Swiss-Prot record:
Entry's transmembrane regions: 444-464, 474-494, 524-544, 552-572, 581-601, 669-689
Protein name per its UniProtKB record: Protein white
Species for this entry: Anopheles gambiae
Organism phylogeny: Eukaryota, Metazoa, Ecdysozoa, Arthropoda, Hexapoda
Top-rank lineage group of the source organism: Eukaryota
Region described as Disordered: 1-33
Topology relative to the membrane: Multi-pass membrane protein
């Protein structure tokens, strides 16, 4: 098929007339209001600039956005490169990678692939702009670049300019005025819709906004996005916990981002995984936001013709280049002038995506077609108009006005204080613990069943030669059970929540330390209740040392072990990239510490090259403390001899057999506390490094 690149598409005046009268417009005020918004922001009057960026009040969801507060987002010369492959190249030392991560410095790399090539565009207030293209065309890459959220290993050219109302912005300035709804919906499954939005409102809205205003704002958003009927329904997890439907989850994601009433909204594949009805309802919500004056940019793979009619502008991307940017009416005219008109009664979106896709076995022909289409658009009057609009960034503007403090945002870039962040994380984590049956009911039932089984096996031990060995084995089994039960419980729960943390941290909802402290403190009562149930059942059944002091000491030691193993589980979870990896790493790492516990290998027989590693074994300190508590007060003759020609064991001999000393009891307790602190600090460091690597 031959493309005619000599035809023109009419002058700007006729094109404006066609655009303003096209049937895709939602209301007659949009074209005039968008032109007025752009002209207003291009003035040199500083008073006008101050008016544009003045703090707005919350709760304007249902009303029109004032003209002075509307945003036009422009971008120019966006070039994005992928990271060079490392095959055959030596990897940097660990210390170098840690230093680079801490200082946010990355090594230079040679471009592997030119992902986006000189992309320029504009999105005006009151418009719903849809970015379309085939898989791998660069839609999500472009949206990430516009949101300043490109993943690690992706480099954006320094010449790229992103501007709001003609004023160049950086990541912090855009984040304060923009919301980004990502493709994957990540929530805490056990929370209700209202609880999730209350948590988001407490952290997203300004620190000076009263709590009553935040609660009122949550109710407003629930009504605006038709979430009132499911406000008290748990969110759930698809395929695991019954909860919200796909459309409700997507609207909840919008609700979370629109609590602060941002005037610029970026959405990555908002209809992904939804049926046609749900997809239409979601886009109707976005269309309604645009009609009120918001600027909406979304990516969509292949919309139906019904959805296509909702778009005010479309941006076609192919092979990292802009193939078209304009109204649906202009797109039909553009492709007709090229000699490839959309057939009658055919979905234009399907037609454009097919024309810009790389078909198997026809790569060269398809790439040649894409190149001709992109080249034709680059020299068209539509592209020149877009370039002129995007080129005004910084002209006649006094950039320091963009650097003024946004309402409610502190000097650290967070909208809420440290204490508010900690309180909200603690509140959400505590609700999650109480409402998740796997965390409380199932774990306590499991603990009671295991304790009853162990108590039945070792039931009624007497103080003789066999009883001493059995009691020593049962006490070490206390430690083994507490360790594996809590390590795997933490890995399954904490690792599953890490993606939510990483996304919320990148949105600057809270700090790493507030999240870690709030999360671990909220789960602390559970890790006290589990050893209490276990010890209270097994201790009397086995017949361990009588007396409240001995029982409470055993309970205290077992509780310490439960929290040491929990801390170690946090460390493994934060250092692992996935749940499967953490579950695979956990047992091999725990086994050496178990061997160094003194039951399988005498502490005096530990090889010299493993001596320092044995100091990190909580089995060693806890086993010694438990045996001291059990045998140190046993007097001579209390242990009976049931077999002839056998020396009756004494308490000193029992402890010396393991190379344990009574005077080390206090040191053992101190070491258990030290390991809790050490492992949790290590987990916090790993969590901080992971969050930094994602920014």
């Amino acid at each position: 098929m031959t493309i005619n690149t000599d035809d023109q598409y009419g002058d700007a005046e006729s094109k404006t007339t066609i655009s303003s009268s096209r049937r895709y417009s939602s209301s007659s005020y949009q074209d005039q209001s968008m032109d007025d918004a752009l002209n207003t922001t291009l003035t040199n009057d500083k008073a006008t600039l101050i008016q544009v960026w003045k703090p707005k009040s919350y709760g304007s969801v249902k009303g029109q956005i004032p003209q002075c507060e509307r945003l036009t987002y422009t971008w120019k010369e966006i070039d994005v490169f992928g990271e060079a492959p490392t095959d055959g190249k030596p990897r940097e030392p660990l210390c170098t990678r840690l230093r680079n991560c801490c200082t946010r410095q990355r090594k230079d790399f040679n471009p592997r692939k030119h992902l986006l090539k000189n992309v320029t565009g504009v999105a005006k207030s009151g418009e719903l702009l849809a970015v379309m293209g085939s898989s791998g065309a660069g839609k999500t890459t472009l949206l990430n670049a516009l949101a300043f959220r490109s993943p690690p290993g992706v480099k954006i050219s320094p010449n790229a300019v992103r501007a709001l109302n003609g004023v160049p912005v950086n990541a912090e300035q855009l984040r304060a005025r923009c919301a980004y709804v990502q493709q994957d919906d990540l929530f805490i499954p056990s929370l209700t819709t209202r609880e999730h939005l209350l948590f988001q409102a407490m952290l997203r809205m300004g620190r000076d906004v009263p709590a009553s205003v935040k609660q009122h704002r949550v109710q407003e958003v629930l009504q605006e996005l038709s979430l009132v009927k499911c406000a008290d329904t748990i969110i759930g997890a698809p395929g695991r916990i019954k909860g919200l439907s796909g459309g409700e989850r997507k609207r909840l994601a919008f609700a979370s981002e629109t609590l602060t009433d941002p005037h610029l909204l970026l959405c990555d594949e908002p209809t992904s995984g939804l049926d046609s009805f749900m997809a239409h309802s979601v886009l109707q919500v976005l269309k309604g936001m645009a009609m009120k004056g918001k600027t909406i940019i979304l990516t969509i793979h292949q919309p139906s013709s019904e959805l296509y009619c909702l778009f005010d502008k479309i941006l076609l991307v192919a092979e990292g280049r802009v193939a078209f940017l304009g109204s649906p009416y202009q797109s039909a005219e553009f492709f007709s002038q090229l000699g490839i008109p959309c057939p009658p009664n055919y979905n234009p979106a399907d037609f454009y995506v097919q024309m810009l896709a790389i078909a198997p076995a026809k790569e060269a022909e398809c790439r040649d077609m894409i190149k001709k289409i992109c080249d034709s658009f680059a020299v068209s009057p539509i592209a020149r108009e877009v370039l002129e609009t995007a080129s005004v960034a910084g002209k006649g503007m006094d950039e320091p006005y963009m650097l003024q403090q946004v309402e409610g945002v502190g000097s650290t870039g967070y909208r809420s204080s440290w204490w508010t962040q900690f309180y909200c994380i603690l509140w959400r984590s505590w609700l999650s613990v109480l409402k998740d049956p796997m965390l409380v009911k199932v774990r306590l039932l499991q603990t009671a069943m295991v304790a009853t089984l162990i108590g039945s096996i070792y039931f009624g031990q007497v103080l003789d030669q066999d009883g001493v060995m059995n009691i020593n084995g049962s006490l070490f089994l206390f430690l083994t059970n507490m360790t594996f039960q809590n390590v795997f419980a933490v890995i399954n729960v904490f690792s599953a929540e890490l993606p939510v943390f990483l996304r919320e941290k990148r949105s600057r909802l809270y700090r790493v330390d507030t999240y870690f402290l709030g999360k671990t403190i909220a789960e602390l009562p559970l890790f006290i209740a589990v050893p209490f149930v276990f010890t209270s059942i097994t201790y009397p059944m086995i017949g361990l040392r009588t007396g409240a002091t001995h029982y409470l000491t055993t309970l205290f030691i077992v509780t310490l072990v439960a929290n040491v193993s929990t801390s170690f589980g946090y460390l493994i979870s934060c250092a692992s990239s996935s749940i499967s990896m953490a579950l695979s790493v956990g047992p091999p790492v725990v086994i050496p510490f178990l061997i160094f516990g003194g039951f399988f290998l005498n502490s005096a027989s530990v090889p010299a090259y493993f001596k320092y590693l044995s100091y990190l074994s909580w089995f060693r300190y806890a086993n010694e403390a438990l045996l001291i508590n059990q045998w140190s007060t046993v007097v001579d003759g209390e242990i009976a001899c049931t077999r002839a020609n056998v020396t009756c064991p004494r308490s000193e001999i029992i402890l010396e057999t393991f190379n344990f000393r009574v005077e080390d009891f206090a040191l053992d307790i101190a070491c258990l506390f030290a390991l809790i602190v050490l492992f949790r600090l290590g987990a916090l460091l790993c969590l901080w490094l992971r969050s930094r690597s994602k920014e």
